[in-house]
Amino acid sequence: MRTQIYLTIAFCTAVLAASPASAQVTYGKKPQLPAPFATESAGNGPSETKPPAGFLPSVPAGFHINIFAQDFKQPRFLAVAPNGDIFLADTGGGKVVVLRDPQHTGGAQQREDFAEGLNRPFGIAFHDDYVYVGNTGEVLRFRYDKRTSKRLGDAEHILDLPTGGGHFTRTLAFSKDGKKLYISVGSSSNIDFEKDQRRAAVLVCDPDGKNSRIFSSGLRNAVGLAVEPLTGEVWVSVNERDELGDNLPPDYFTSLKDGGFYGWPYSYIGGNVDPRVKPQKPELVAKAIIPDVLLGAHVAPLQFAFYTGKQFPESYRGGAFVAEHGSWNRASRAGYQVAFVAFKDGKASADPVPFLTGLVPDPGGKNVNGRPVGVAVAPDGALLVSDDGAGMVYRVSYAP
């Protein structure tokens, strides 16, 4: 079986619009991967990420895209409140912003700060009368008015999180029954051993921060974190390790098992040993779980959202939209798009296919036209996509 290095990019736009689930299924199969160092490790980050004036990304036939909101410092995680308001983590600005479209124009007419002075906020979740925010070193919660989205009082600190090194994002998601809070914490490095076992892991705790423990481990940097609505399973999108070559290893999108181990730093995609890591732990590698869906090497998947709306065609219902921030460690760029993964009965049923594209004018060039980060399904079924390269939020609607 071929390695998933985005061969699906060959699918034409018409096929994507009509049948996004038509790609070859890899779910549950053991992938064949290239050898480590089959190519040199390339340092190839983009020089410029701002799009030219008037630019809009491409979407499949029948869909429409427009700018929903703009002029943010670093727009990242998106979340939809129970009342339909859109919450956005403007990470570079150290704040959480509320966006509204009361006249249903397709653009945010109202914009106000919910909380400021935060430390690189990212994850946002709602539970009872609280808005939860993942700062890089802690979980905070704010009591708020669920009708108006107005904050009621100061932040309450409920849990310390490890800090330092790389991978500062802290993503939050509540269990289907609301009794547990899941928190993703990335590693501090590429492949070094961690002193704090809570890194490169997904944690779980009570809504008040008590009884925290490791839920799943061996996850180098699980930036995306959400609960699948039908099954209640926890899913993550994972940024795998760098500097093994252009096509190794694939980043991935997978469900998690309580107590499951996913390889890092000893191995990747199951039992594929990283020769740089010494000493090895073969007993752990033997337990490493193969992820559900491979996304492609170095595409940098960040937030994802399960499509729970009714506006898009039936073939998109229940599937997942995955924002790919884009590569720096490939000679030719990969990612820089939003991909779609079809689901059936709460399980991934097909390879990912491109959905929002057009951000890379020249795969061998230095400039790109944006870097997707966040995705969320708006109350009307449109898809919202934050782009921290462009400093804006796009809205994708279906209008055949």
Outline where the language-model segments fall.
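A short loop-to-beta-strand structural motif that recurs across blades of beta-propeller domains
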Residues: 95-98, 138-140, 201-203, 252, ...
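Surface loop/turn motifs at the tips and blade-to-blade linkers of beta-strand repeat domains
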Residues: 67-72, 112-117, 158-164, 214-218, ...
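Asp-box/WD-like beta-propeller blade repeats and closely related beta-sheet repeat scaffolds
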Residues: 111, 120, 125-127, 137-176, ...
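Beta-propeller domain segments
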Residues: 24-60, 169, 187-190, 197-200, ...
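Structural WD40 beta-propeller signal
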Residues: 71, 81, 127, 175-177, ...
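Blade-level signature of beta-propeller repeat domains, shared across WD40, Kelch, NHL, RCC1
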Residues: 376-400
